[in-house]
Amino acid sequence: MCIRDRFIIVIIMAILSNLELDNKSDITRIAHLACFIVIATITVATFVQTVNMLMTTINTMGTLMQVISPFLLSVLIATGKISTTGIIQPLLLFLASSVGFIVTYFVIPLLSISVAFNVICSISENIRLEKLSKFFSNVSLWTIGVVLTVFLGVLSLETSLSSSVDSLSVKTTQAAVSNFVPVVGKFFSDSFEVVVGATKIIGKTGGIIGILGIVIVGIIPIFKITSIMVIYMLLAAFVEMITTDKLILKYLSGFVNVYKTMLGILIGVVILFVISTGIILNLVNSIVT
């Protein structure tokens, strides 16, 4: 259903609400309920489609992360970051698999419960579940925030420690080859620097391509969710001008909060993958020669 049809149905509901306030007729109540059922069906169907898009996007980014991770890890090994690779590899695999799992089996159910409570509490003023609906929506967003904070904190700490060890190992290897290998030791030491430099360039190029891929995958769903959220915000603002019915306004505002949460979750996951790839790029470029 197009945006125009949604506006028309909302206007009809607002008019019926005003008539219901003036005339307690069963016919107007039934008509109002019928319009609400139509709106609820449309909004829930849109929510389901958006959820499927969100899950597909996150799973695609996870798959992309699994594809570029072996390449970047190979670059780390080639540049002497053996200790770092041993730490980053399980963390990246955990990231790629766990984010999709958390979103699918924890975040999405919480959002679905939030939407269900929003629909139920909008049927009658005597049903008050809006606070509970907002709570479940906020918990789903907090979950992604905690995952992002903990993972990036651990990754940054571990890679900083292991990076120092690996850099020292690289310098020690160069010094040993240069000083103890007769005649050609200095040549091999200088060649090692050239190889490391070339490997860093290759790794940087691959990492940038990976970051661009993640951003491209995430940018279209971000715009779609933003547009849906703006539509509901406009509907809520329009309803507020033409009717005093708080149920319609509460219903639309509830979906605005849900889509804000979904937008925050998707942006958070994109940032998580981009920063993780950026940390690896920084490690590739931090080889001390």
Regions found by a protein language model. Name each.
Residues 6-11, 38, 42, 69-72, ...:
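Residue-level signal for the membrane-embedded core of alpha-helical transmembrane segments
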Residues 205-247:
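Helical hairpin unit composed of two closely spaced alpha helices linked by a short loop
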Residues 163-201:
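Membrane-interface interhelical connector segments
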Residues 186, 190-194, 231-289:
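Transmembrane alpha-helical segments and their short flanking loops
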Residues 28, 32, 42-107, 121-136:
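Membrane-interface helix-loop-helix junctions at boundaries between adjacent transmembrane segments
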Residues 1-3:
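Short, small-residue-biased leader/transition segments that mark boundaries at the very start
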Residues 61-68, 99-106, 136-150, 195-198, ...:
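Loop-to-transmembrane-helix entry motif
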Residues 16-22, 45-55, 80-91, 121-129, ...:
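Transmembrane helix-loop junctions in multi-pass membrane proteins
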